Structure formats: C-alpha cells, structure tokens
Amino acid sequence: MTEFWLISAPGEKTCQQTWEKLHAATTKNNNLAVSSKFNIPDLKVGTLDVLVGLSDELAKLDAFVEGVVKKVAQYMADVLEDSKDKVQENLLASGVDLVTYITRFQWDMAKYPIKQSLKNISEIIAKGVTQIDNDLKSRASAYNNLKGNLQNLERKNAGSLLTRSLAEIVKKDDFVLDSEYLVTLLVVVPKLNHNDWIKQYETLAEMVVPRSSNVLSEDQDSYLCNVTLFKKAVDDFRHKARENKFIVRDFQYNEEEMRADKEEMNRLSTDKKKQFGPLVRWLKVNFSEAFIAWIHIKALRVFVESVLRYGLPVNFQAMLLQPNKKSVKKLREVLHELYKHLDSSAAAIIDAPMDIPGLNLSQQEYYPYVYYKIDCNLLEFK
C-alpha cells in the first residue's frame, strides 16, 4: 500500500516522548503501520494572519502540485508505451524510490532556504512547478503531434486491402504506364469469389485486355488483382465489378508521391526516436523536481496547521505512518484514542458523522491531530 499518513501532535514533555508514544501504539505493539519521524526544520512562523491565509493557499498549491506530479507520471507512462512495467523504476525522487524519499525526508535547504518567510518558500515552489507544468504542455504537444502524424501514416499501411495504402505492395511492372489509351486498375477480389473473377473479368466491360490480370497480394479475406483495359471503358467496368462484389480501388501509380510518403514516414520515425531519449530524461528530472516540491508543501502544511492548532512556541512532532492495508480502521481508532483530548469538538467524529462550522473538510478528513494523506499511487494504466 503506497499511502502515507503525515500527522503531527504537540510535544509532551519532549517531542521524543510524543514520538515514542505513537510508535509504541501503532508499530511496536501491534503492527498497524510502519512509523517514522518526519523532519521539519525550524521555519519562520510570521504572524497569525499570514498563517491563516497561507493555510488556504497551501491547500490549493498542494492540489495543483499533486496534479502536475500525476500528469508528469502519466505522460511518462504514455511515452514509454510498451514498457509500462519500466515506468515505476523511472519515477524517482532525488535518485531514490518514492517510499524511500518520503520516509527519509530531509528539507532541501539550498532550494528552499529556511531564512525565507513561509510565504516566500511557497511562492518559490509555485513558480517552479508552474514552469514544469507549462513546459510539459509544450513538450507533450510537440511529441504528440509527431506521434499522431506517424501513427496516421502507419495506419495507412495497415489494415485490409480494402482500406490500406497500396503503395508498399505494388511495383512499376504491375502497371501499363504512359499509354494514351490503356490504364491498369487495381481490384480487391474476395477469396470466395476469385474463381468468378478469373472467369468474368475479361467480359465485365468491353475492351478489357485478355489475360491482363494477376494476383499482386493477398490478406485474410481478399486478393489484390490488377487488370488492364481501355480508359473509356473504366466507368462501365467499375459499375459491373461492384455488382459482382469486386471493388476497384482508387489508385494511380506515381513514383514521386510514393517516394515522398516513404521519406515522410522515415523522417517522422527518425524524429520520434531522436526526441524520445531527451523527452524521457526531461520527464525523469522534472518528475523528481515536482515530487520533491510536493512533499515540501506537505511539510509546510503540517508546520502551519500545527502552529495554528497547537499554538506558540512551536512545539510539535511530525510523524509519518504507512498503514497496514488490513488495519486502516483500527489504526484510525488508536490515533483517535491517543489524541482525542486535543480537540473536544472532534471527539465524537469517529463515531458520529457531523459538519463542523467553518471547516471546508468532510468529517472523514478532520481529526483532532493534524493529518495529511500522501498517496503515491500516481498512475492510472488504461
């Protein structure tokens, strides 16, 4: 289960005691979760007004950055196409897997200097992730256009003889070319009707060249045959052929056009290969950047909410729980027993659903302790 609960509780005599109490109740004694300390440095508190406003801003920023993280991860899966099993190993943060990064989280002092105000730090994060989001849109658009154009050409060369491009199938020798009077048509003949074709094609219209039909290709259901006749008999031949379930394809042999199509396909294929490597590298780097930013936002939210709830001086312990999938309900109950004294209005919530005025949270999300979920299930495979 790649879901974490990031919680905080006020320090008792020491923050270490708070941690030991939680660890004993959730991990040591009953294996409800894997627990670890979550290290948040001494950030600048600022004024109460700023903290209240920042609490709302960080909630919005959290949702935005989570969305960007998921978009980058999902686009990585789209780009890797047949290698989706390899996607997870490319989704790293600071070169390690996501679980390791979260459980060993250390604040990045270089990127987000703690001498800056909380608001400034949140603005640095917002600016960086907005840039990633904009870059992703432009890179994805360019790559998707290239991929789409290539797929369109590939589709033309796939499918049945009734619909696919015939340029790759036929040769110059299959046609009478540059004749004032004669023309070669290509006809799709159902295999079940092939004997009828052999018997009838010379008499479907006047002026069909005898013994001019050969099988050029076949698929599961049909043969592709050529036939040569006088140009003025083409319309009549088409009409009679259709009546007998023989389909004349619209095709003119043009070497220049065929060469241009082939060159275009080769160019697109080469361009796609050239762009693939740098794009995957960009996605890896920027997934890491966005994910790191996201976890720093979680740390900011815990800090701000803990100060707002537990007051000053700053005295709380942030802790990370990775719930045992089968014990989620029990874990919630244990946490409730540990911390229900912190907020009398929340004491009944676990048993009795209720709305709390002034809180934009459903009752399932509000607890007497500070709580934020980190869900590392970032991919939705189709």
From Swiss-Prot:
It is a peripheral membrane protein. The keyword DNA-binding does not apply. This is V-type proton ATPase subunit C 1. InterPro entries: ATPase_V1-cplx_csu, Vac_ATP_synth_c_sf. Expressed in brain (at protein level). It comes from Rattus norvegicus (Rat). GO terms for molecular function: proton-transporting ATPase activity, rotational mechanism. Belongs to the V-ATPase C subunit family. It is found in: Cytoplasmic vesicle, Secretory vesicle, Synaptic vesicle membrane; Cytoplasmic vesicle, Clathrin-coated vesicle membrane. Keywords: Acetylation, Cytoplasmic vesicle, Hydrogen ion transport, Ion transport, Membrane, Synapse, Transport. One of its GO terms (cellular component) is clathrin-coated vesicle membrane. GO terms for biological process: synaptic vesicle lumen acidification. The modification N-acetylthreonine is found at residue 2. Subunit of the V1 complex of vacuolar(H+)-ATPase (V-ATPase), a multisubunit enzyme composed of a peripheral complex (V1) that hydrolyzes ATP and a membrane integral complex (V0) that translocates protons. V-ATPase is responsible for acidifying and maintaining the pH of intracellular compartments and in some cell types, is targeted to the plasma membrane, where it is responsible for acidifying the extracellular environment. Subunit C is necessary for the assembly of the catalytic sector of the enzyme and is likely to have a specific function in its catalytic activity.
